[in-house]
Regions:
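Interfacial helix-loop-helix hairpins and adjacent transmembrane helices
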Residues: 1-13, 293, 303, 351-415, ...
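Solvent-exposed, non-transmembrane loop/terminal regulatory segments of multi-pass membrane proteins
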Residues: 8, 23-67, 76, 122-149, ...
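Interfacial segments of transmembrane alpha-helices in multi-pass membrane proteins
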Residues: 209-260, 329-333, 619-664, 734
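Hydrophobic, glycine/alanine-rich multi-pass transmembrane helices and their short helix-loop junctions
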Residues: 226, 314-364, 627-633, 655-666, ...
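Hydrophobic transmembrane alpha-helices and their membrane-interface caps
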Residues: 236-284, 641-690, 730, 757-760
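Helix-loop junctions and hydrophobic alpha-helical segments within the transmembrane domains
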Residues: 291-318, 697-720
């Protein structure tokens, strides 16, 4: 590699030039239903909902207007102007509000208007007519959907076009809606609010993209500054940045070429590439620094360090790849993709290290007499505090030598307690808690939760006869009454706050002198004329003798996980019981489609999202452990020594999950994959430590001398790389997306835990299993 370094370096630059434009095509898959296994009922029900009604993304545009019900109609006319601006957005399919309902009622009222006694207020708006029965009925139906009970919070329900019907991205549609909200000052109103599951998901993904870029930049910058300040080497600072950034671009280019998309699970791709690249670069740099003390020139020092380090570097990246590849055993597609992506990234870092470092480490930039002052000489300075740090590391080893049994026993006890705690894990189901409490989205949601009856929007899909009958609609309304009666106890009870379907709209329309005299199908045709495609979101047109009716549900988003899961289960049970009654069976006869009902929507998806991601965590963790043990057995040529690495590497993730279990801290997306990630973060250090120990022993060093050398030299590399990465991960604590904050904190804690495990638990296990004390035990 060193002899042909310029050839390899040229090839790497050529690959970089090719991969850079391709990497820009890597996309985010922002669909939530793919976060579930293909056969998961939650996913199949959602896909069924989407296939029947097409439009399933509901966004609520809300604002405050004290004059909404003004007798002069000023409030409704202002609302109409705002709605028409929203309807002009290409990505919006339907916008339903009070002004549209008012227009519909006016059309129904016009043929009989000449027989009405004129009102004293001279209003032109039927919706403002307090003596109109149909007006009162429609106000009641849409309360919580288009306006609050108090009447000051106005809502426009915006149904977005599905992806197959528009080229406009959801992000662009939401941006246009926000621009309208920001312009309400021209109407004399406060800025508008935008809520809805699509809004939460899009904002979450936006934050994740920004956080991934931030972590990559901050982590590599921290490492570069550490090298620049500590070792006074601009050369190696640039090398570390080059390795990480080259690996990132190449990985993203490969994924784009393979037509893979990033998801919410794999969004932290850059962070893991940074971890592997930083740790590997730091180990080689310190190995090169040691070699420079005994070798005559930089090339010999680099060759000497490469001979000593190629094996741990190669196997560290391979074990990383194996650990991540274990996620392919998960049932969820994005988790499988995440594992494959990270396995590829691990191998790309391996290539990047060997094609970039030899050339850049030996690159003659300026004459030697100027190189040192510029920080680009071949030599590296001693890091400030080097001797005290090494003494501290050896002091830890001395203490471990004295109490190895106590250390190992304490580690086992902690591990058992942590495992028991991890069995008590709860998942976070309130997606709004993924944002900071002062975020505009959270403030808007709190208003909707309080005044519109809840921000959780979901649906029941029921089969409907080809020709609607009054008996069928009565059964639907009976079911709605049962759904409204459901209540889940808790500190604050949870129930459905709104239930609405075509049956309610039809019932209210019968108060109209026109529609009340018509058949149900005729009323349906009339409503299609005045309400447009909104009716098609409530009931489908007959296709192959089948049609479906949609019951729109609303409930509080901010509730305990157990309550939300219980409410979903109760709704499913109630619906299942309803479609199995004798009356239902008589109505449909032998039609098999009569039993095809579903409960779905973003509320259901978000409630069960984290549970879906963590469902296979322990199985994947077990596969990763076995895979890493096999790889370590080959690398160390000792299955027993490889087994010694399992506990230190598993301990950090057990401790994090155990702490969350015992304290009742809900697991969100940021902590969902920490077990697999943590294993990959700490195994590299163990491998470097043990291979150095083996090499010292094969060179004739005593057990204690080999352990001391490993603790002093490799321990320093572990300490410095951990410091740089903890600073990088710590930068995520400033994110506005709470799962990113949790990921940064748990990853930092995991790395510190891995550091302690490798510098305390690992030596204790080596002493007990391979040291002089173990030989005495065997003799006894």
């Amino acid at each position: 590699m060193i002899r042909w370094r310029w050839i390899w370096f040229s090839i790497s630059i050529l690959l970089l030039v090719v991969a850079q434009p391709v990497s820009l095509r890597l996309r985010f898959d922002r669909s939530l239903h793919r976060m579930f296994a293909p056969d998961d009922p939650t996913r199949t029900d959602f896909e069924f909902l989407h296939s029947q009604f097409g439009v399933s993304d509901l966004v609520v545009f809300a604002y405050r207007d004290e004059r909404l019900w003004a007798k002069d109609g000023n409030g409704l006319e202002r609302l109409q102007r705002i709605r028409e601006r929203i309807e002009a957005i290409p990505g919006v399919a339907i916008a339903m509000d009070l002004s549209k309902i008012d227009q519909m009622l006016e059309q129904l009222d016009q043929p009989f208007a000449i027989f009405r006694t004129p009102k004293g207020n001279g209003t032109r708006h039927v919706l403002l007519d307090e003596d109109n029965a149909i007006t009162d009925a429609f106000k009641a139906i849409f309360e919580g959907q288009t306006h609050s009970r108090q009447g000051t919070l106005v809502a426009i329900a915006c149904l977005l076009k599905p992806a197959n019907q528009t080229t406009i991205a959801v992000r662009e549609t939401l941006l246009n809606l926000r621009q309208i909200g920001d312009s309400l000052a021209t109407e004399g109103l406060e800025d508008g609010m935008l809520v809805g599951q699509p809004v939460m998901v899009e904002e979450g993904f936006d934050e994740i993209e920004q956080d991934g870029k931030r972590l990559s930049i901050v982590s590599t910058t921290c490492l570069a500054l550490l090298i620049l300040i500590g070792f006074r080497s601009l050369r190696w600072a640039i090398i570390s940045i080059a390795v990480v950034q080259w690996s990132l671009i190449m990985t993203r280019g490969l994924l784009a070429w393979l037509a893979w998309d990033l998801t919410m699970v794999s969004s932290m791709l850059g962070s893991i590439v940074t971890v592997i690249g930083v740790a590997t670069t730091m180990h080689w740099m310190l190995g090169y620094q040691r070699a420079m003390k005994s070798q005559s020139n930089p090339e010999e020092a680099l060759r000497y360090s490469m001979v000593g380090l190629w094996r741990p570097i190669v196997w560290a990246c391979i074990t990383d790849a194996i650990g991540f590849a274990s996620l392919a055993f998960a049932k969820v597609g994005p988790v499988q993709d995440y594992g494959c992506m990270m396995a590829i990234a691990s191998l790309v870092v391996l290539v990047g290290i060997f094609v970039l470092v030899p050339t850049m480490a030996l690159l003659p930039v300026v004459p030697k007499r100027f190189a040192k002052s510029l920080g680009i000489s071949y030599e590296l300075a001693q890091i400030p505090g080097d001797e005290p740090l090494r003494k501290c590391l050896l002091g830890i080893l001395k203490w471990v030598n004295r109490w190895p049994v106590a250390v190992a026993f304490a580690a086992m006890v902690i591990c058992v307690i942590a495992v028991l705690g991890s069995l008590r894990l709860k998942v976070e189901t309130d997606f709004i808690k993924n944002f900071r409490s002062d975020a505009p989205l959270v403030v808007a949601y709190q208003a909707v939760e309080k005044e519109l009856g809840g921000a959780g929007v979901w649906d029941v899909i029921l089969p409907a006869p080809k020709v609607l009958s009054q008996r069928y609609l009565d059964l639907v309304m009976d079911l709605e009454a049962k759904l409204l009666a459901l209540e889940v106890p808790g500190m604050e009870s949870l129930r459905l706050t709104k239930v609405m379907s075509f049956a309610d709209v039809d019932h209210a329309s019968r108060a109209s002198p026109i529609l009340g005299r018509l058949s149900i199908e005729a009323r349906l045709m009339g409503m299609r004329q005045v309400m447009g495609s909104f009716v098609d979101t409530l009931i489908t047109r007959p296709v192959d003798e089948q049609r479906f009716l949609r019951i729109m549900l609303r409930s509080r988003e901010q509730a305990e996980a157990a309550q939300k899961e219980q409410l979903i289960a109760d709704v499913r049970r109630t619906v299942d019981e309803a479609i199995r009654t004798d009356e239902w069976i008589v109505l449909f006869g032998d039609d098999a489609a009569a039993s095809k009902a579903a409960v779905s929507g973003y509320y259901v998806l978000l409630t069960q999202l984290v549970s879906s991601v963590v469902a296979d965590q322990w199985r994947c963790f077990a596969v990763a452990t076995v895979g890493i043990w096999i790889a370590m057995s080959i690398a160390l040529r000792s299955p027993w020594m490889a087994l010694l690495t399992v506990l230190p590497n598993a301990l950090p993730s057990f401790c994090i999950l155990g702490w969350m279990g015992w304290t009742g801290t809900p697991v969100n997306l940021g902590a969902a994959m920490i077990a697999a990630v943590s294993m990959g973060l700490s195994v590299d250090s163990s491998l470097h430590y043990l291979i150095r120990f083996q090499r010292e022993r094969s060179d004739g060093q005593s057990f204690q001398a080999a352990l001391t050398s490993s603790q002093s030299e490799i321990g320093m590399a572990i300490l410095l790389s951990t410091l740089a990465l903890v600073l990088g991960f710590g930068s995520l604590a400033t994110s506005n997306f709470i799962p990113t904050v949790v990921f940064g904190i748990t990853a930092s804690i995991s790395m510190v835990g891995g550091l302690l495990s490798n510098l305390v638990v690992m030596p204790a296990l080596l002493i007990l299993s391979l040291g002089p004390r173990s030989e005495r035990w065997k003799a006894n």
